[in-house]
């Protein structure tokens, strides 16, 4: 089975008019319900999650106290065979976390992950290879969207406020 979920932080960053008619809720209960319904009917369970990991995969140290990323909890609480994530713009090479094989490619289509699965009576085995993207973007596409890109960058560069003191990463 393939279950697709998205971070519920979409509700925070997206304009309400873009979400008209769509309900985006906590991804954990939705994934749990889908998995429970389907897992006995399939050989492999796969969750595709537009979200990332809230903990360091090597140490378990909390990286973020928000609920924007919950992939670590997905692996702890649910038993998907595979979890494909994408949100944090960092590579997670194939590894097993709490019994779930997890991967995450970096941003902007710079790479992709080739995943192979072997299912037998002895169990399930997953491997992955990170493959750098190659080739070049067509010049006409770059030219066609250059104005839109400049507009987006100008908008992102607008000052929205000032602080009385610098806000550094360790500022309480």
Residue ranges of model-derived segments:
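A short C-terminal boundary segment appended to hydrolase-like catalytic domains
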Residues: 119-172
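Acidic, metal/ion-coordinating pockets
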Residues: 1-141
């Amino acid at each position: 089975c393939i279950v697709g979920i998205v971070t519920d932080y979409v509700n925070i960053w997206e304009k309400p008019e873009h979400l008209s008619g769509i309900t985006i809720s906590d991804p954990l209960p939705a994934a749990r319900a889908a998995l429970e319904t389907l897992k006995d009917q399939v050989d492999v369970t796969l969750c595709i999650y537009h979200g990332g990991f809230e903990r360091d995969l090597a140490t378990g140290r909390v990286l973020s106290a928000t609920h924007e990323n919950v992939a670590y909890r997905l692996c702890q609480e649910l038993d998907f065979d595979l979890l494909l994530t994408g949100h944090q713009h960092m590579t997670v090479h194939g590894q097993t976390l709490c019994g779930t094989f997890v991967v995450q490619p970096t941003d902007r289509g710079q790479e992709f992950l080739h995943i192979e699965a072997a299912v037998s009576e002895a169990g399930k085995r997953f491997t992955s290879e990170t493959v750098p993207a190659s080739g070049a973007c067509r010049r006409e596409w770059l030219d066609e969207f250059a104005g839109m890109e400049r507009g987006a960058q100008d908008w992102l560069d607008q000052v929205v406020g000032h602080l009385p003191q610098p806000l550094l990463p360790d500022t309480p």
